[in-house]
Amino acid sequence: MMNFRQRMGWIGVSLYLFVSAAAFYYVFEINDTYNKLALEHVQLKPQEPHRGTTWTHSLKARLLSLPFWLWATLFLIPYFQVFLFLYSCTRADPKTVGYCIIPICLAIICNRHQSFVRASNQISRLQLIDT
């Protein structure tokens, strides 16, 4: 039997995936402005910048010239973090909520490594008695 937190977790996961699919469809199929901006970016630009360009135009031009893998990384890491957090809310054990978030995951891994080193040091100090 699912409790309230699990039900809300599944509702959150389904809404998150639905909104993601709708945004993906909007950006890549419907939005003509995005297509125009992509075409303007590809067209040849004059070598000498116009004197009337503002810092926002130059910033936009520099940001649009960044590689695709960088943009994908910047958007996908937070996207997957939110998704994995919502998915962890669907677990039956409330202590496991949030373990898949990167800072928490790194803290747990480091803590396990330190406890493993302590345990191995304690075992090496013990003397085995042969009977």
From Swiss-Prot:
The lineage of its organism: Eukaryota, Metazoa, Chordata, Craniata, Vertebrata. InterPro entries: LYSET. This is Lysosomal enzyme trafficking factor. Keywords: Golgi apparatus, Membrane, Transmembrane, Transmembrane helix. It comes from Xenopus laevis. Belongs to the LYSET family. It is a multi-pass membrane protein. It is found in: Golgi apparatus membrane. One of its GO terms (biological process) is regulation of vesicle-mediated transport. Required for mannose-6-phosphate-dependent trafficking of lysosomal enzymes. LYSET bridges GlcNAc-1-phosphate transferase (GNPTAB), to the membrane-bound transcription factor site-1 protease (MBTPS1), thus allowing proteolytic activation of the GNPTAB. GNPTAB is involved in the regulation of M6P-dependent Golgi-to-lysosome trafficking of lysosomal enzymes. LYSET is thus an essential factor for maturation and delivery of lysosomal hydrolases.
